[in-house]
Amino acid sequence: MTLTFQAVQVANGHDEEGRLVFAEGRLIGVLVQLSGLHEEQGVAGQWFLETGYGRGLSGEHPTFPDLSAAEEWIRQRLER
């Protein structure tokens, strides 16, 4: 399965760096890099699944230390 990540700017006021996630050309999720406002929670700079679409991703909102970890988690979910 081919996953692609497209860089985008997200207009939510603070966590602006984002990635659209596509599987075989279909949008399956939106990842947002958490800003310094999340330092107290210990997740600043990590990637957050803002929204996911389809089986295994809908309703999930985990954080990941980097995009590689996010990709691995998404692949595992899609292969279920």
What residue ranges belong to the model's regions?
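A short, charged, amphipathic alpha-helix used as a generic interaction element across diverse proteins
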Residues: Y53-G54, T63-R80
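A generic structural signal for ordered secondary structure
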Residues: L27, E60-P62
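Intrinsically disordered/low-complexity terminal segments and short unstructured peptides
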Residues: M1-L3, E50, P62
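Negatively charged, low-complexity tracts enriched in Asp/Glu with abundant Ser/Thr
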Residues: M1-R26
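Short aromatic-glycine-(Arg/Gly/Cys) micro-motifs in beta-strand/loop hairpins
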Residues: L31-G59, Q76-R77
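Intrinsically disordered, low-complexity regions of eukaryotic proteins
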Residues: E17-R19, G52, P62
